[in-house]
Amino acid sequence: MTMTHPTFPMDLDTYQPLALDPTCATLTDAQRATLKANIQLCRDAIVFFTATGAARGVSGHTGGPYDTVPEVMILDAFFRGAPEQFVPIFFDEAGHRVATQ
């Protein structure tokens, strides 16, 4: 019997680690483009997993997690850009559409 190894339908390797300086109030065009691409990738993954869960009868909804992706991506970039200033832990109140803390 031949074993097949299905591939994940999204290329998660396109995620681009981004380091932002939290003291800088503006983004460069390149930083903005990277941030937007990372947000879209994560949102697409959330929708994918919600849809495949729905197909199995075990899903909820994308609402809160989908809505908080921009905050999470910005926090991740701050964690990378100034690691000495942050404890790199995300608290999201279970994705119930509250601000990520």
Predicted regions and their residues:
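Thiamine diphosphate
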Residues: 2-101
